[in-house]
Amino acid sequence: YDPETEKFVLIDTCFFTHHLQFADDENDTLWLSGSTEAVGWLNTRLYDETGDERNAQGWCPTVVDTNGDGVITKPWNEPDMSGDFVLTAGDVAIDPALDTRIGSLDKFQRAYGVIPHPDGSVWISRRYPVPGQLIRLELGDNPPETCKSEVYEPPYDPAGDPKAWGYGPRGIDVDRNGLVWTALGGSGHLASFDRSKCNVLNGPTATGQHCEQGWTLHQTPGPRFKGAEGTSANADYHYYNWVDQFNALGLGENVPIATGTTSDALLALLPDTEEWIVLRVPYPLGFYSRGLDGRIDDPGAGWKGRGIWSSFNTGSTQHLEGGKGTASELVRFQIRPDPLAN
């Protein structure tokens, strides 16, 4: 959509589109998730200059270097398109002499969140199969031929302690230092992942559960499920998350925030102290949050010139507070430096 001309232009793509995120690069690259068969992007600068939608877009398959030779080569191990075969926790039936492609036609096992990384890579989240995955994608010099992926699963040992499990990554974002954050909608954590702590990045053992030391799981506040006291399961549901890189809210830079989707709240984690700040929308207003972003409209106006915005939406708003006729809304949050600040 062009605000100046008030015209919409439809751009055909050869890949699925779902979540979208602009990269901070010279091409204003727009990355789109929706599949693991092909993770795609649009060079918006080139498209604006030429109107050539075919040459302005590109895509990569997600293929992991499981033979450890440092490059991706064909033929590779192809996934069972039901999604049950590839790179799940436990035994992985792959030919170790080949690389391995990740993929599924099951909509719940496709790529979900997407975020460009400061090092030039792109990360996507995959919710299923349990425990879910984060996938790091490098384009190389000549994509799609040079695309290479890495896969990382939250800590999940079916034979181990359920309190240590993490599962269900949905949202994904990154701070200015390159630390990746994801909301684990299944286990109820806001989790960070630091790839620099990994000893193994590729090879036959790099199938997901090979870098537990890179993960830090922060259990979100809130009630537990009855009968689930011995597990990590939280009764809250975290649809997505976001990192406040530029102090738009007022809690500082690089503060990760998860949606408390079923607790009428946003959950901000202060990374230095691991303190939770809960931003609650009071009952009976209702607040089924599914995403958020920040705006600094006037850097010189103090707290009044900045804030974050979150969507209040679901497919069945009639079941929320307000009943039939309840509409989706946008909610703005601002934090005063002290209660009397004007």
Regions flagged by a language model, labelled:
Residues 19-27, 88, 92-96, 100-119, ...:
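Structural signature of eukaryotic scaffold interfaces centered on beta-propeller domains
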Residues 1-15, 45-107, 143-165, 197-242, ...:
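Surface-exposed loop and turn segments in beta-propeller and other repeat-based domains
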Residues 107, 128-130, 261-262, 320-326:
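Short, solvent-exposed loop/turn segments at conserved positions within beta-propeller repeat blades
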Residues 28-33, 121-125, 179-183, 254-258, ...:
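Conserved beta-propeller blade signature
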Residues 1, 40-49, 134-142, 191-196, ...:
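Hydrophobic/aromatic beta-strand positions that recur at structurally equivalent sites within the blades
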Residues 132-134, 147, 188, 264, ...:
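Repetitive beta-architecture junctions, highlighting loop-to-beta-strand starts
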Residues 25, 34-37, 44, 127-129, ...:
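Short loop/turn segments immediately following the C-termini of beta-strands
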Residues 40, 189-192, 284-342:
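Blade-level signature of beta-propeller repeat domains, shared across WD40, Kelch, NHL, RCC1
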